[in-house]
Amino acid sequence: MRINPTTSGPGVSTLEKKNLGRISQIIGPVLDVAFPPGKMPNIYNALVVKGRDTIGQEINVTCEVQQLLGNNRVRAVAMSATDGLMRGMEVIDTGAPLSVPVGGATLGRIFNVLGEPVDDLGPVDTRTTSPIHRSAPAFIQLDTKLSIFETGIKVVDLLAPYRRGGKIGLFGGAGVGKTVLIMELINNIAKAHGGVSVFGGVGERTREGNDLYMEMKESGVINEQNIAESKVALVYGQMNEPPGARMRVGLTALTMAEYFRDVNEQDVLLFIDNIFRFVQAGSEVSALLGRMPSAVGYQPTLSTEMGTLQERITSTKEGSITSIQAVYVPADDLTDPAPATTFAHLDATTVLSRGLAAKGIYPAVDPLDSTSTMLQPRIVGEEHYETAQRVKQTLQRYKELQDIIAILGLDELSEEDRLTVARARKIERFLSQPFFVAEVFTGSPGKYVGLAETIRGFKLILSGELDGLPEQAFYLVGNIDEATAKATNLEMESKLKK
C-alpha cells in the first residue's frame, strides 16, 4: 500500500472506510481491542489509538496486532508508552502493517520505529513508503556468487574478509574503537562502492546514539550543509522505549536498506547495534503475550524471529545488503541461546581487542581471534590465502614466545625466533592504519588500501626484504610504499639530530 507520510504520517494509512474497535483491556504495553463481528484486523496490522487522556493531553499511540484471541478480540503490542489510555477508547484499524518512508530522502535523517523523523529537520521529503513486514527474497532472486566485500581496511580484508551480502558479527567492549570502525566502514563503502548505509540502534543507550550522530556530522558522513549528500540513515529505538518498539526497530532499518538494494540497485551496509537487544525485546513481548518461556527464559520463537530478520539480509541479482551486527554476549557465555542463535547466521566475526587498543594499534582488530568463512583458497585465491596463513603463523609464534621474552629477554631467543619476533612486530604495526573519520583527532590523513596492495605489503614483510627498516616506520601507514618512505624520513631525521 502506497501512503503519503507527509500528510498522514509514517506508519499510518488513511482508509476511506475506517474499521473501528474499542480497547477492552490494558496491561502495560499490551492492549486487547474488541472489533465488530467479521471486521477483525489481520496479524501485524497497525492499529492507531487517538484521543485525549483525563487531563486533556492528546494521545496518539500506534500498536501492532500480535494475536487473535477469539470473541472478536485481538491482542496488540504498543510501539510507544500507553500512559493515559483507557478502556473504551476508540481504535482505528489501518488495514496494513506499519509502513515507513524509504529512498534517498531518508539519508542524513534520524527516525523512530514508526519512520517518523526525530531530528527536528521537518517532514521527510518522500511519498514512497514500504511495509516493515516482508518476505525474504525468493530463491531464484538470490545471488549465490561468493565475492569479497573490500573494505579498504587492511586487517579485515587480509585476515577475516567480509562477504558481499554477508553477515558479520562485531565483538567488542567499551572504548576499543567499535564506533570509529563502524563510521570508517560507512565512509569507505560510500566512496569505493557508491553505496549507502543504514544504522539501526536497537535497544541502545540514548547517549551512544547521540554521540554517533554528532561524530558522523563532525566527520562528514552526515553532511549538515547538504543533507542529500549524506551517506547514512539512522533508525533508533533506545533502551527506554517499550519492548514492541525495540523488537521492530531492526525491521524498520532493514526495510529502508531493502529499498536501496531492490529499487536503487545499490550495495548497502546495514549496521545493527545491538542484535542481542532485538532478542531481549522479543523475549519481553513473548512473556507479555503469555507464551511459555523456553531455554534460559527466552521466547519459544527465538530461532524463527532471528531467521525472519536475518534471511531478509542477503544478496540479490539487483544489489546486496551486507550487515555488520554488534553482538553482546551475556556473562561472556557463548552458549547462551541469544549469541548461539546469532552465530548460526554469521559469515565472519571481527573481534576487537583491548590489549591492541592499549598498545595504540587502531583498528584494534584481533588478527588471531577474528574469523571468516571466506578465507578459503578457492574463494580468495592461493596468494591471498597463503599470505594470510603465514601472517597468522608469525603472529601466533610471537604470542607463544612472549612469556620467554618477558622472563629471559630477547637475547635468549634463537636467531630464527628473533627474526620471527621482529617481523611479527612489523606485521602488528602494519595492521594499523589511519582512518578518514579519525583525521580530526589524529591529524594524519586517512588511507584506503586496496586488497592487492595489502597482500603485496605483507608478502614483502614476510619475505624478509624489509628486515632492515625500523618497526615504527610501519605504524599508522597505508600501503607498504608509505612505510619505506616513512623509514627514509626517520633515517634523515635521526641524521639531522646528530
Curated annotation (Swiss-Prot):
- Gene3D superfamilies, per database record: 2.40.10.170, Bovine Mitochondrial F1-atpase, Atp Synthase Beta Chain, Chain D, domain 3 (1.10.1140.10), P-loop containing nucleotide triphosphate hydrolases (3.40.50.300)
Tell me the InterPro entries matching this sequence. AAA+_ATPase, ATP-synt_VA_C, ATP_synth_F1_bsu, ATPase_a/bsu_AS, ATPase_alpha/beta_chains, ATPase_F1/V1/A1_a/bsu_N, ATPase_F1/V1/A1_a/bsu_N_sf, ATPase_F1/V1/A1_a/bsu_nucl-bd
> How does the protein's chain sit in the membrane according to the entry?
Peripheral membrane protein
Keyword list, A-Z: ATP synthesis, ATP-binding, CF(1), Chloroplast, Hydrogen ion transport, Ion transport, Membrane, Nucleotide-binding, Plastid, Thylakoid, Translocase, Transport
Q: Which domain of life is it from?
A: Eukaryota
Q: Does the keyword DNA-binding apply?
A: no
Subcellular localization, per the record? Plastid, Chloroplast thylakoid membrane
Any one GO cellular component localisation term in the record: chloroplast thylakoid membrane
Disulfide links within the chain:
none
GO MF assignments: ATP binding; ATP hydrolysis activity; proton-transporting ATP synthase activity, rotational mechanism
For binding ATP, which residues are annotated in this chain's numbering? 172-179
Q: What is its EC number?
A: 7.1.2.2
Q: Which GO terms describe its biological process?
A: proton motive force-driven mitochondrial ATP synthesis
Q: Which reaction does it catalyse?
A: ATP + H2O + 4 H(+)(in) = ADP + phosphate + 5 H(+)(out)
Annotated HAMAP family = ATP_synth_beta_bact
Q: Which PANTHER family match?
A: ATP SYNTHASE (PTHR15184), ATP SYNTHASE SUBUNIT BETA, MITOCHONDRIAL (PTHR15184:SF71)
> Subunit structure of this entry?
F-type ATPases have 2 components, CF(1) - the catalytic core - and CF(0) - the membrane proton channel. CF(1) has five subunits: alpha(3), beta(3), gamma(1), delta(1), epsilon(1). CF(0) has four main subunits: a(1), b(1), b'(1) and c(9-12).
Entry similarity comment: Belongs to the ATPase alpha/beta chains family.
Q: Which NCBIfam families match?
A: atpD (TIGR01039)
Q: What is its biological role?
A: Produces ATP from ADP in the presence of a proton gradient across the membrane. The catalytic sites are hosted primarily by the beta subunits.
Q: What is this protein called?
A: ATP synthase subunit beta, chloroplastic
Native source species? Eucalyptus globulus subsp. globulus
